[in-house]
Amino acid sequence: MDNYTYSELLKSLQNKCDNIALIIKPEKIKQELERIEKEQEDPNFWQDVLKARDTNKEKVRLNRLLETYQKTKNSLDESVELFELAQNDNDEVTLSLLYEEAPTLEHSVQKVEIEIMLSGENDASNAIITIQPGAGGTESQDWASILYRMYLRWAERRGFKSEILDYQDGEEAGIKGVAFIIKGENAYGYLKNENGVHRLVRISPFDANAKRHTSFASVQISPELDDDIDIEIDEKDVRYDYYRASGAGGQHVNKTESAVRITHFPTGIVVQCQNDRSQHKNKASALKMLKSKLYELELEKQQSSAKNEEKSEIGWGHQIRSYVLAPYQQVKDARSNIAYSNVEAILDGDIDAILEGVLIAKA
């Protein structure tokens, strides 16, 4: 990096910071935080528990956004000042240090941009994830299990928790399907763009001739809705099936019909849950999954209508990302059009750069 390149980078980051300030309005955030603090001082504040909880969540979000912005702006202002001094004094040591820290500075500005993008209605929610293998038997079932592990490892890296709702083992390897929740702040916001078909190209470990195979798996993401969000489901529109649990989470197989499957006739959505020994709890979890999927479906319809698009173009059936392991190694996202070479790390859950790249591309 040279002086000109660094100078242009600073100008770009300053423009971004100025735009961020126009969007978030730091002074208004401070005023809103003061208003919330006064409201919390009222002895009657906690009488409405749901409202108090939502207010507190908003306070935490605003505080974090303001602190992240101010910290980034201070770092940027300091870098601009140091750069001017170092140039005037021909201080090569300071200039070299500034060049080294440039990626960190750029990343911190990007983090503030991401914070703004994760301020949607359900972005702070937990994420319900369903993974289904495509056609292709063992190959696709194994690919589905690799994706499942990738998301679990991503959750672990972030300190998030996960909970299995339904798990079906594959016949020879992998899984026939899995549904699980990732619990953590902004889990849905980060993962919401993972909806779609994920494609894998590799030398098959199940082919004695070591031929290259292409496999597909679909990923569906929906927000775990708060209990106070009301989604009406007419009982005549659903069918409940009860069966014996099997696979991971179904250790009590062949003892009780605790697993629950719900079919929603108007949409064709099918959800199932077998993670608990209690049929009642599994039914409640399955209903929560169904409500989340119906909510997500309604959002898609609204977005499709607003953009004048066919649902097929924005639904779950389109290919969003390719993972190529042979003859070369590359992961490429169709939305951001960015290619990544650290395939092994990505499949081990290092997907933040991909998720953030898509968020920025869709902003």
Curated annotation (Swiss-Prot):
Keywords, ordered alphabetically: Cytoplasm, Methylation, Protein biosynthesis
Subcellular compartments: Cytoplasm
Classification via InterPro entries: PCRF (IPR005139), Pep_chain_release_fac_I (IPR000352), Pep_chain_release_fac_I_sf (IPR045853), PrfB (IPR004374)
Disulfide bonds: none
Mod. after translation: Methylated by PrmC. Methylation increases the termination efficiency of RF2.
GO cellular component term, pick one: cytoplasm
Molecular-function GO terms, alphabetical: translation release factor activity, codon specific
Modification sites for N5-methylglutamine: Q251
Predominant localisation class: cytoplasm
Domain of life of the organism encoding this protein: Bacteria
Entry-linked NCBIfam families: prfB
Protein purpose: Peptide chain release factor 2 directs the termination of translation in response to the peptide chain termination codons UGA and UAA.
Family to which the UniProt record says this protein belongs: Belongs to the prokaryotic/mitochondrial release factor family.
Name of the featured protein: Peptide chain release factor 2
Source species of the chain: Helicobacter pylori (strain HPAG1)
Gene: prfB
